[in-house]
Swiss-Prot record:
Species: Escherichia coli (strain K12)
PROSITE patterns referenced in this protein's UniProt entry, alphabetically: HOTDOG_ACOT
Annotated gene: yciA
CDD domains the UniProt entry points to: BFIT_BACH (cd03442)
Domain of life where this protein originates: Bacteria
Protein family: Belongs to the acyl coenzyme A hydrolase family.
Full protein name: Acyl-CoA thioester hydrolase YciA
Cystines in this chain: none
Function: Catalyzes the hydrolysis of the thioester bond in palmitoyl-CoA and malonyl-CoA.
Transmembrane segments: none
GO biological process per UniProt: acyl-CoA metabolic process; butyryl-CoA catabolic process to butyrate; fatty acid catabolic process
Cellular component terms (Gene Ontology): cytoplasm; cytosol
Length: 132
């Protein structure tokens, strides 16, 4: 995982709005929803690298740094940190932009984790990543 940075590391792969239906019992955005968004965003980059279907096989070091509020813009940034024969490891950071609550315009990193994806064939069996 990356060290602390003041700017997102990687490419913007997903941007969405945190909605009331995604809250936990405390009124903050549910961590599982954030993890789902990260998996979707990471899979977008992994599919581009693999030139096809991938499956998530591992999530490492999930760290929730700050809460996310309803109305916040949630941005997933992803970067490839390792390629294997069939797998790719993607570091994913979630950055939030406050647009519905104070302080308006503030940006901060809310969470980060390392996701590992494996390229698979139509039968779901691992296949080699393309050689670049």
């Amino acid at each position: 995982m990356s060290t602390t940075h003041n700017v997102p590391q990687g490419d913007l792969v997903l941007r969405t709005l945190a909605m009331p239906a995604d809250t936990n019992a405390n009124g903050d955005i549910f961590g599982g929803w954030l993890m789902s968004q990260m998996d979707i965003g990471g899979a977008i980059l992994a599919k581009e690298i693999a030139h096809g279907r991938v499956v998530t096989v591992r999530v490492e070091g999930m760290t929730f740094l700050r809460p996310v509020a309803v109305g916040d813009v949630v941005c997933c940034y992803a970067r490839c940190v390792q390629k294997g024969t069939t797998s790719v490891s993607i570091n994913i950071e979630v950055w939030v932009k406050k647009v519905a609550s104070e302080p308006i315009g503030q940006r901060y990193k809310a969470t980060e984790a390392l996701f590992k994806y494996v390229a698979v064939d139509p039968e779901g069996k691992p296949r080699a990543l393309p050689v670049e």
